[in-house]
Regions:
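N-terminal regions of proteins, emphasizing targeting and processing segments when present
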Residues: 5, 20-21
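N-terminal loops that bind phosphate or other acidic moieties
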Residues: 22-151, 155-271
């Protein structure tokens, strides 16, 4: 029995001592900002195995921290190292995954996760999703055309503007973004792995619901929400449709919206 009240990695003293003949399936999610699902299960397995109890680890993810390791482990995929910008535009090491069938696995928290920044540094007015666009570009240049995107655990609330900016910088040199969407990204399909259904804007949107945990003051929340509204309005005028109110648009600081509006992504809820 796992004791997670304080994330203290202790086993309950009941029910496990006399169960050595049993096989335990360990299927946990990550502890936000603390341990990935694989790390949690490794800790549990170490204690159980020491008591002679057999374990099977099945890492789980809601799309946030640990999604990449869980997905690649489950599919037998590989991790590809990349050098990108983090949420404060500092150069950093990151990874994306590639499954045996060539599907790219991208965990946005690799580029703009809460775990990448100290609590006192959190500032969603400055934090950017630029590195997410770089992750996508690296995978596309490698030849990947099918993507599974893990949304969650971010310290950003930029509605995906940073990600779009990176894609423009990388793919739209010498041509407009619409042309780049068709030529460079037109063959790509994106499936979003997400466990929230918030819209982009409003009281239930990205800024109001998740902004405070990312360091936003009440004044920042209002500014972030207004910025997202303006971005959605301009985007709707350009494309002739608006996906900002769809469930999950507010996921990962609004990255869900940018993926759906600009890249035609499909939202999939679940673990």
């Amino acid at each position: 029995i796992w004791h997670s009240k304080k994330n203290d990695c202790r086993l309950s003293r009941t029910q496990v001592i006399n169960k050595r003949h049993m096989k335990y399936i360990l299927a946990t999610d990550s502890f936000k900002g603390c341990m990935s699902s694989q790390e949690v299960e490794d800790e549990i397995a170490e204690v159980l195995n020491a008591k002679g109890i057999e374990t099977v680890c099945l890492p789980m993810s809601d799309g946030g921290d640990g999604m990449l390791s869980a997905f690649t482990a489950a599919t037998g995929g590989t991790l590809e190292p990349v050098y990108i910008h983090d949420l404060m535009m500092r150069r950093t090491d990151a990874h994306y995954g590639v499954t045996p069938d060539g599907t790219a696995i991208v965990e946005v928290a690799q580029a703009c996760g809460l775990s990448l920044i100290k609590e006192e540094e959190r500032n969603p007015m400055r934090a950017t999703s630029y590195g997410v666009g770089e992750l996508l570009a690296r995978a596309i240049k490698r030849g990947c055309r099918k993507f599974v995107i893990g949304l969650g655990g971010t310290a950003t609330s930029d509605a995906g503007i940073g990600m779009i900016k990176a894609l423009v910088d990388i793919f739209a040199r010498g041509k407009n973004f619409d042309e780049a969407l068709k030529t460079e990204l037109g063959e790509c399909s994106f499936t979003l792995a997400c466990d929230v259904d918030n819209p982009l804007c409003g009281e239930n949107g990205a800024a109001h619901v998740y902004g405070p945990q990312k360091g936003a003051t009440p004044e920042m929340v209002a500014q972030l929400d207004r910025r997202a509204q303006l971005f959605a309005e301009k985007s709707a005028l350009h494309f002739g449709f608006d996906r900002s109110a769809e469930p999950g648009a507010g996921a990962a600081g609004g990255l869900g919206y940018a993926f759906m509006q600009y890249l035609g992504a499909e939202m999939k809820s679940g673990a």
